[in-house]
Each structure stands twice: as structure tokens, then as C-alpha cells.
Regions:
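Multi-pass alpha-helical membrane architecture of UbiA-family
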Residues: 1-331
């Protein structure tokens, strides 16, 4: 009994400090919903109650039909898909702690794992159980189980440095190239579900499906780079992009990727809400100003703080675009 109490005590400590369950579960659902709906509504979908609707010309199509539309009820599949995003990101968080435990003992000794307040055994038992539950739910309810397997296979390779730790761990750019694509694979997992469930209404090779693959990928890339850009006086033994390439070049790279990202956003919302396009234009202009300001005076603020604020506002705009479209239609 005492061991069980200790187990849950350690889990509580870990989730509170490293991965708050409630907020991250909501985030997982939001990530799923943004990609799910942005693809569907660009393909002509609407909503009727708790059903996704597509207009049909031929009444011979399989599935429920009502007033000239085909109905696809929302249900357990959508919940499982959102939960999978939450679960997978939780696993990556723990896997990162395992991978970085030696350097964390020096640089982040206050964290739950390096401080000894949480043991590896507890986290291994928990994450093994969580992965098993997630795979079972996908096998039972999801039509795209193979894409779940691909996602978790890639995550497993990340956890062991793709069996090339001696090379990747010492190279920040190589780590970025091998690890950052996981966001693309996560997006493909969601989109594959949309394509399979709503066949033949969703074309996997449409411009909207392809661009949706990069939704949240570019923001994740920008954040990953900018959190490792520092002013020269703030550098430590921790390897950063600013230490490798200089803070000006690293900032320019992040700024270019930000503009590539916003162009994909413009295309995805152009036919849905012109007000959203204007808001996104204002946001990217502000972020560009902050990039240029940081290049001029890197000690004025932490660049990643501005990027996080921009990303929250950007993604909130994308989500509100979906909500407004579903409620009132095109603007």
C-alpha cells in the first residue's frame, strides 16, 4: 500500500511540474481539433448538431443521408485521436528527461527526475501503461491504426537517438533534423484519420491536406530554435544555436520560417475568414518587428518569450476561424 501511495505521489509531482495533465489534455484536443476541422471545412464540410456534413448529389452513397447531405457523427474516434496526441506528447516529455538526465543533473538539478523526487522506475511503469492503453484504444476504435504504429515507432527511435547517440547528441542541428519531423508525423496521423473516415470527400493530396501537415510543425520548429537563441552574455555551457551560428543568423532563420508558416496559414483561412487573414498579417508584422529588434539589441528581452506570445495568438486565431466558420459560415 505504501508503494502505491509513493507511486502516485511521484506521478503527481512530475505532472505538476513537467506536464500538467488537465491543461495538456485540453491542448491535445485543441491540436487535434484545429487540424481536423481546418481540413474538413476547406473540403466543404459543415456541421449539423453533432454531425459533420457533406453535400451529396447521388443518394446511393453509403451512410446516413438527410436533406441532401451525408452525415458523419462525431464520436469516440475523435476523442481517441485527441487523447493520442496528449499521450504521445507525454511520452516524449518523459523520454526527453531520460535522454538528458546526465546534463540535467548539472543544469536543471531542481527538476523532479534529476533531484530524485521522482524515480525512473515510476516513470517507466507509468509510461509503459499509458502507451499500452493508447495503442489498445487505437487498435479498437481507429481506422488508421497503422499510422499510430508509425508515430510511436518514430517516437521510439527518437528515444534511443536513432541508435546514433554518439553523433546526434553532440550535434544540435542533427538533433533538430532527426527529431523535429515528429510534429509532421503527428499531423499526418490526424489527417490520415480524417481522410479515411470521410472518404471520398477528403482528398489526401489536395493543397489543404498537404498544407495542414505543416500546421503546428513550423510553430514547433520556430519555438525549438528560438528557445536556444541567447544574447552573448547569457550563454552557458549549454549548446545553443546562437553559440553555433551567432544570434543574428539564428534569428534571421527563425524569422524566415515564421513567414513561410504564415503563408500556409493565409492559404488555409483565405476562403473561410478574411478578418482572420488581416489579424494574422498584423501578428506576423509584430513578430517580424520583434525579430529585428532582437537582432539589434539581444539583451532587451528573451526572444522565445515573444515567440510564445505570438504563437498563442496565431493559433488562437486559427482556432477561432474554425469556430466562427462553423457557427456563422464564411466571412
Amino acid at each position: 500500500m505504501e508503494k502505491i501511495k509513493q507511486f502516485f505521489k511521484e506521478l503527481y509531482i512530475y505532472q505538476k511540474e513537467m506536464y500538467p495533465i488537465i491543461s495538456r489534455l485540453i491542448l491535445g484536443m485543441i491540436v487535434f481539433a484545429e487540424i481536423y476541422f481546418i481540413v474538413l471545412i476547406n473540403m466543404g464540410a459543415g456541421m449539423s448538431g453533432m454531425n459533420i456534413t457533406f453535400p451529396v448529389d447521388e443518394m446511393s452513397l453509403d451512410g446516413a443521408l438527410w436533406n441532401g447531405v451525408k452525415l458523419f457523427p462525431l464520436g469516440i474516434e475523435e476523442l481517441v485521436c485527441g487523447f493520442t496526441i496528449f499521450s504521445f506528447l507525454f511520452w516524449l516529455r518523459i523520454a526527453d528527461d531520460f535522454k538528458d538526465r546526465e546534463i540535467d543533473k548539472r543544469l536543471f538539478s531542481h527538476r523532479p527526475l534529476p533531484s530524485g523526487r521522482v524515480t525512473e522506475k515510476t516513470l517507466k511503469i507509468f509510461i509503459s501503461t499509458l502507451i499500452a492503453i493508447t495503442l489498445f484504444l487505437n487498435l479498437t476504435f481507429m481506422p488508421n491504426f497503422i499510422f499510430c504504429v508509425i508515430l510511436y515507432t518514430y517516437g521510439s527511435l527518437m528515444a534511443v537517438w536513432f541508435f546514433q547517440k554518439h553523433k546526434i547528441a553532440k550535434s544540435l542541428p542533427l538533433a533538430l533534423i532527426t527529431h523535429n519531423p515528429v510534429q509532421l508525423i503527428m499531423n499526418i496521423y490526424i489527417i490520415s484519420f480524417v481522410v479515411i473516415k470521410f472518404k471520398p470527400f477528403v482528398n489526401p493530396f489536395s493543397i489543404y491536406s498537404i498544407l495542414a501537415v505543416f500546421t503546428l510543425y513550423f510553430p514547433a520548429l520556430i519555438w525549438e530554435v528560438t528557445r536556444k537563441i541567447r544574447a552573448p552574455k547569457d550563454e552557458t555551457e549549454y549548446v545553443t544555436y546562437s553559440k553555433l551560428f551567432g544570434y543574428r543568423k539564428s534569428t534571421t532563420f527563425a524569422m524566415v520560417v515564421t513567414w513561410i508558416d504564415i503563408i500556409t496559414n493565409f492559404i488555409l483561412v483565405w476562403n473561410l475568414n478574411k478578418v482572420s487573414v488581416a489579424i494574422l498579417a498584423v501578428l506576423v508584422s509584430w513578430m517580424t518587428w520583434k525579430f529585428l529588434e532582437f537582432k539589434k539589441e539581444p539583451t532587451k528581452f528573451k526572444l522565445v518569450d515573444k515567440v510564445e506570445r505570438y504563437t498563442y495568438l496565431q493559433e488562437s486565431t486559427m482556432i477561432l476561424t474554425v469556430v466562427v466558420y462553423l457557427l456563422v459560415g464564411k466571412i
